[in-house]
């Protein structure tokens, strides 16, 4: 019980602490950071690929990103569960 409470307190601290450490900081994505580095290193660079679909807003882009991650996690955990169930079935036989 004590160990569980200690782990829970650590998880809560890890979630909340970054908001106080970097208060007022800007949370940018890696795409934006990569784009700024490319522009700094090679200003003449022209992208050779355009996205097939450009979301109408940032909210839709976030939704699609979240759905993609959720679908990927569902596939991974389905496969893990399937393999675990198959292993249990084989152990019983």
From Swiss-Prot:
Coiled-coil portions: none
GO biological process, any: cobalamin biosynthetic process
First-listed, main subcellular location of the protein, grouped into a coarse class: membrane
Keyword Membrane part of the UniProt annotation: yes
Alphabetic keyword roster: Cell inner membrane, Cell membrane, Cobalamin biosynthesis, Cobalt, Cobalt transport, Ion transport, Membrane, Transmembrane, Transmembrane helix, Transport
Segments crossing the lipid bilayer: 5-25, 63-83
Subcellular localization: Cell inner membrane
This protein's GO CC annotations: plasma membrane
Amino-acid biosynthesis in keyword set: no
Domain of life per record: Bacteria
Topology within the bilayer: Multi-pass membrane protein
Biochemical pathway: Cofactor biosynthesis; adenosylcobalamin biosynthesis
One MF annotation (Gene Ontology) recorded for this entry: cobalt ion transmembrane transporter activity
HAMAP family: CbiN
Subunit and interaction comment: Forms an energy-coupling factor (ECF) transporter complex composed of an ATP-binding protein (A component, CbiO), a transmembrane protein (T component, CbiQ) and 2 possible substrate-capture proteins (S components, CbiM and CbiN) of unknown stoichimetry.
Similarity comment: family membership: Belongs to the CbiN family.
Role noted for this protein: Part of the energy-coupling factor (ECF) transporter complex CbiMNOQ involved in cobalt import.
Name of the protein described by the UniProt record: Cobalt transport protein CbiN
Organism from which the protein derives: Salmonella paratyphi A (strain AKU_12601)
Underlying gene: cbiN
